[in-house]
Design a protein with these regions (language model features):
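Structural detector for short beta-strands of small beta-barrel domains
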Residues: 1-11
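Short, structured beta-strand/loop micro-motifs enriched in basic residues and often containing a Trp
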Residues: 20-28
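Short, Lys/Arg- and Gly-enriched loop/turn segments at beta-strand edges
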Residues: 47-55
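Short aromatic-glycine-enriched beta-strand elements
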Residues: 14-18
Length: 55
């Protein structure tokens, strides 16, 4: 599985709304994301696992 990089655009309740570097929009439940995820965070989705990237 190819790694996919996302930027969190907004958080509404229990869901984060994000856009990949390829422009694909996605919505993910916050409990699945790493602690510290916030609007503007960069995330990596690889091997069915989320990683919060350093700023």
């Amino acid at each position: 599985m190819e790694p996919v990089y996302y930027t969190v655009d907004s958080i509404d309740g229990d869901y984060a709304y994000m856009t990949s570097d390829n422009g694909v929009e996605n919505q993910v439940a916050m409990f699945l994301l790493p602690d510290g995820t916030d609007v503007g965070s960069r995330l990596l989705w690889e091997n069915f696992e989320w990683t919060l990237l350093p700023e």
